Amino acid sequence: MIARQECAATVLGGPTTVLDLGGLRIVSDPTFDDPGPHGYLTKTAGPAVTEDQLGPVDLVLVSHDNHPDNLDDRGRALALAAPLVLTTRSGAGRLGAPATGLPLWTSHTVPRPDGGELIVTAVPAVHGPEDAERDADGFVNCEVIGFILSGPGLPVVYVSGDNASIGTVAEIARRTPSIDAVVLHAGAARVPARFRNRALSLDSIRAAAAAAILGLAEIIPAHYDGWTHFSEGRDDLVRAFDDAGLTARLRLVDHGTWIPLRP
């Protein structure tokens, strides 16, 4: 079992990230299946840490349940065994208990073992090009949310979910001006049948642009490897952040390595 940290994050592969905050163990977008085909997507690598090594999980964040690279079979089992899952409103309906759907800009408060509170706020995400056709509910691709995690004595952490919109990042930065760290989904995910094969998540150049918008926040990239439809990887991120002069803000380490988080 991996030991709990006081305040830290680690990316396990794909989008899956563990955050230890205020005595809570939080997992975002859990994907623990073995490599292989998952419908029209193909997974190429398993996680750096398996779900049985995590120990008890207090909270699962699911940006969307529609795609297996964000919630696969074993990730779904982990989520449904947790005390609480926070996700989209439509996703909560599909997942059932213990999932709670959060409308945009609403918050859910989670008690912390240290006596404080963790506040989880749902923020927007656009899962594809801004000008793409939207569904009947106004969503590109499907309903997706990101999350702002905050609380007394804790860093403010933004988990982006699958977002391709710089405008959305700017809106979040305006409304949450004191973000300390960002789990930023990148990878320029592309599916030929969707939106003329345009990116469904941030490419590396736009990830660096998002970092510039987000001020002094440390950037922890996720969602850039482990699946064949991710068209950009680690080297692209390193190059883009170097070109932008933002390498000092980039926290790109081996999967399973803890990154300390500070207010």
Model-found features: residue ranges?
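Metallo-beta-lactamase
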Residues: M1-R4, V85-P155, R239-R262
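Conserved catalytic scaffold of divalent metal-dependent phosphoesterases
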Residues: V27-D34, L102-V110, E117-G128, S165, ...
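Pre-active-site segment of Zn-dependent metallo-hydrolases
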Residues: L21-V62, N66-D69, D73-L78, G128-D137, ...
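Cap/insert and terminal regions of metallo-dependent hydrolase folds
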Residues: S90-G93, A164-H255
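Alpha-helix capping/helix-boundary segments
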Residues: H67, G75, G91-A92, T106-S107, ...
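Conserved beta-strand elements of the Class I
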Residues: T10, V18, V27, D58-L61, ...
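Zn-dependent metallo-beta-lactamase
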Residues: M1-V27, T31-G36, Y40-T44, V126, ...
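Active-site neighborhood of phospho(di)ester-bond hydrolases with catalytic His/Asp-centered motifs
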Residues: V27-D29, P56-L71, L86-R89, V157-N163, ...
